[in-house]
Design a protein with these regions (language model features):
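Acidic (Asp/Glu)-rich catalytic clusters
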Residues: 2-8, 28-45, 78, 170-174, ...
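Trp/Phe/Arg-rich N-terminal binding region typifying the photolyase-homology
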Residues: 3-7, 15-70
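Structural preference for beta-strand elements that scaffold enzyme active sites
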Residues: 10-13, 43-45, 83-86, 176-180, ...
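Conserved, mostly hydrophobic/aromatic
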Residues: 12, 77, 182, 248, ...
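Active-site-proximal loop/turn and secondary-structure-junction residues that shape catalytic pockets
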Residues: 18, 50-51, 89-93, 183-189, ...
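Active-site acidic/histidine proton-transfer and metal-coordination neighborhood
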Residues: 56-216
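Conserved small/polar residues in nucleotide/adenosyl-binding loops
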Residues: 293-300
Length: 304
């Protein structure tokens, strides 16, 4: 009801949050979200996200059951009008920040990642926890996962990505659902854990594994923009022209001299990204999927 009061709002991005990763989403939970949206003149058409389990990423004996459950969740979401499902393939940690409440000059707070706060930390030895990490893991479990990914390596992670996509994308295409991959955030290794969805070359490789309109991107300008090597407006132009962007995250970041970054205001002058060129690229390529932006403290999501 509150969201409906904002002019121009038409749809909701949501998820089922009380189901353990790897299990099937209950149909009644999906239906409840769709019904609540419909009662308020909105539609539920984007899921963010159905988590990909560590067993899938690592290729353990549990992955086939987890993938089967993932596919069934896709079918159930499609039944209630979902057209796009965002997900990521980041090992162990989701997005990583060192602070969630950095005060800005205008009095707002934002998320930041400062290398000076990361340097010297060793999750294999230290008892640490950073924002964005799965709080359900014990410190011992985190250590075991880090060791497992170190042994798997980048090549092994790519192999398991391919296994997942070849099982999931055909189901999504059959259901008329776009699977929108979120880039690694930030787009470089942390604590030696492989991260592969980081740049144009690797995104091209990912999309080529299963060449389907259902194998697409959630192109987060902030995530890719954390690396100076990524020309974000050109990436937007390229993948939008290919019709391989299912979902946009429009976000600006300010890259600091040592490679640290702060999530900044959305205007181009507030950060390191040319947001004007990014929007221009979307318009000129006829982008017609879904985009959203969020406040810098991850408290509010606005569907555009």
């Amino acid at each position: 009801q509150n969201i409906r009061q904002i002019q121009g709002m038409r749809s909701i991005v949501s998820a089922v949050y009380d189901v353990k990763p790897g299990e099937v989403w209950p149909e009644e939970s999906i239906k409840h979200i769709a019904d609540e949206c419909r009662k308020n003149g909105l539609i539920f058409d984007v899921v963010e996200s159905i988590p990909v389990t560590e067993d899938i990423k690592l290729g353990t004996a549990k992955r086939d059951r987890h993938i089967e459950n993932y596919c069934e969740s896709i079918r159930r979401c499609a039944k209630y009008g979902v057209k796009c499902i965002t997900y990521n393939f980041m090992p162990v940690f989701d997005w990583t920040r060192t602070q969630l409440d950095k005060a800005a000059k205008d009095g707002s707070t934002s998320l930041v990642m400062y290398w000076e706060q990361l340097n010297g930390l060793d999750p294999l030895k230290d008892d640490i926890h950073l924002p964005g990490w799965d709080a359900s893991y014990s410190q011992d479990e985190v250590r075991e996962l880090i060791k497992a990914y170190a042994e798997l390596g980048e090549a092994g992670l790519w192999e398991n990505i391919g296994y997942f996509l070849k099982k999931v994308i055909p189901v999504a295409q059959e259901c008329g659902v776009i699977m929108a991959l979120h880039p690694d955030d930030p787009p470089y290794p942390i604590f030696g854990i492989p991260r592969v969805v980081t740049c144009e070359e690797n995104i091209d490789r990912y999309l080529a594994i299963v060449d389907s309109p259902s194998n697409a991107l959630c192109l987060c300008t902030g995530s890719l923009g954390c690396s100076r090597g990524n020309d974000v407006p050109e990436l937007v132009r390229k993948y939008s022209s290919m019709h391989r962007i299912g979902f946009m995250h429009l976000r600006n970041v300010k890259i600091l001299s040592d490679g640290s970054f702060e999530e900044s205001g959305h205007l181009s002058r507030e950060g390191s990204l040319d947001m004007n060129e990014i929007i221009k690229a979307l318009v000129e390529t006829g982008f017609d999927a879904v985009s959203y932006t969020h406040l810098r403290a991850h408290e509010t999501v606005l569907d555009l």
